[in-house]
Amino acid sequence: MSADIIKPGSPQYWGPRLWRIFHNLAEISDRRDIGMLWPNILKSTAATMPCSKCRNHLTDYLKHHKIISVTNPLTVTGQGIRTQIRNQLHHLHNQVNLRNNIPEFPISSLTHIYGNRPREQILAEIHSLMTEVKDAWQPLLHSSINPGDFTNWKNIISLLISLVSAGPN
């Protein structure tokens, strides 16, 4: 077995998949009723990630940055929610990249990489990636992941996926 093979339980395996899930979800987060879900999703992700360094960095980031900048997201249009989420995830992703000595990527690349596709295609990719992440994390339950946190994370992401599947509002 080659030392270059990335193990499913490692951040190098599930990290890129999580970013694709988040950026894809952000592309279709054009609903007024999901603004309060996003901070909870990221907090739940921080609690669930099997990498303590990643957990601590995300928790610290969330203490100092708001994902949604308004007190009542229902006062913002669906497109406004989408823009805030895309911008904040882009900033978060670049902060992680800088910490890991990976070059930043321009915000203009988000649409090229994640957008300009039918919602159904984006959702299909999200479902596939979610299966890969869940399968990678499942063996780590009890050792690196609290089962209750894992269940909460799956449930809250599933709720967001259900809402964005319905289209904009």
Feature locations, PLM:
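Aromatic-rich, lipid-facing transmembrane alpha helices and their immediate juxtamembrane interface loops
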Residues: 1-169
